[in-house]
UniProtKB/Swiss-Prot annotation:
Interacts with FtsZ via their C-terminal domains. It comes from Azotobacter vinelandii (strain DJ / ATCC BAA-1303). The chain crosses the membrane at residues 2-22. Residues 23-285 are cytoplasmic. One of its GO terms (biological process) is division septum assembly. One of its GO terms (cellular component) is plasma membrane. SUPFAM superfamilies: Cell-division protein ZipA, C-terminal domain. It holds the Pfam family ZipA_C. Keywords: Cell cycle, Cell division, Cell inner membrane, Cell membrane, Membrane, Transmembrane, Transmembrane helix. It is found in: Cell inner membrane. Residues 1 are periplasmic. Essential cell division protein that stabilizes the FtsZ protofilaments by cross-linking them and that serves as a cytoplasmic membrane anchor for the Z ring. Also required for the recruitment to the septal ring of downstream cell division proteins. This is Cell division protein ZipA.
Length: 285
């Protein structure tokens, strides 16, 4: 029996449809294999990426703040920023006499305890990444110098919070760690700390939430050595900020001995910085 044109077209159509179905099945199977391979590669690479990021972050360097000038915050509620060892004890002894002796007690706003703020925050369980037993925290260099400039108000009412805040913000200081103000490399508040400003009256902190009702008789600017990479420039910025505050708010500059700060005193501070840099160069050699 001869096969007609109609039968041939049916056979050819069946073959073409079968070929299309087979090709689609083959492509689908191949794409599954590629997808699985990509997922396995991503999963395998994930721990390594986390490890690299953790190395980039690294341990942050902490900064010690003076405990003098009436600056004695509650260390149990505040983050630890102290330097360990004999240098800290020696430094505390040297700075004990920086507190101001005022004739009349002045009402100052006290910052809300950090522990109360923490209680309001949601608690999450955090996982600690196990570190090798042999790894130890990097020791920071001992603090050698504190350069302190105290600005005392000539008015009995002291420095009012809003005016004080405006002056120091214009000088580039930003509110930060330990509830005090810091001048960073960047005016945006980034980079290393050049110098800081604390309330000269206990507890030494500021409360931004109550700044409109805040007042203080004095504030303390201080620069830590070793600290900024360019201490001379940092010191000049600190002097400029202290002078600006004194001129605008009728204040008086005093040194760490509570004596009136003169041009000779500032030059003596500059010499202390030069001596420190000379010692640093000698140690490097």
């Amino acid at each position: 029996m001869e096969i007609g044109l109609r039968e041939w077209l049916i056979v050819i159509g069946i073959v073409v449809i079968g070929g299309i179905l087979f090709d689609g099945w083959r492509r689908m199977r191949g794409s599954k294999g590629k997808l699985k391979f990509k997922l396995e590669r991503k999963i395998a690479d994930a721990p390594e990426a986390v490890s690299e990021n953790s190395e980039l972050l690294g341990p942050s360097r902490s900064v010690d703040f003076p405990q003098g000038a009436g600056f004695e915050p509650d260390e149990e509620n505040l983050p630890s920023l102290s330097v360990r060892g004999p240098s800290r004890r020696r430094l505390d002894d040297e700075l004990d006499d920086l507190g101001l002796e005022l004739d009349e007690p002045v009402h100052t706003a006290v910052a809300e305890p950090v522990s109360r703020l923490r209680a309001a925050e949601p608690k999450f369980e955090s996982r600690r990444i196990e570190q090798p037993e042999h790894s130890e925290p990097r020791e920071l260099p001992p603090i050698e110098e504190y350069l302190v400039i105290i600005v005392v108000s000539r008015d009995g009412a002291g420095f009012k919070g809003p005016a004080l805040l405006q002056s120091i913000l214009e000088s580039g200081l930003r509110f930060g760690e330990k509830d005090i103000f810091h001048r960073h490399e960047s005016l945006a508040g980034n980079g290393e700390v050049l110098f800081s400003m604390a309330n000269a009256l206990k507890p030494g902190t500021f409360d931004l939430d109550d700044i409109d009702h805040f007042s203080t008789r004095a504030v303390s600017f201080f620069l830590v050595l070793p600290g900024p990479r360019h201490p001379k420039q940092a010191f000049e910025l600190m002097v400029a900020a202290a002078r600006k505050l004194a001129q605008e708010l009728n204040g008086e500059l005093k040194d760490d001995q509570r004596s009136v700060m003169t041009a000779q005193t500032i030059e003596h501070y500059r010499q202390r910085i030069a001596d420190f840099e000379r010692r640093q160069l000698t140690h490097k050699r």
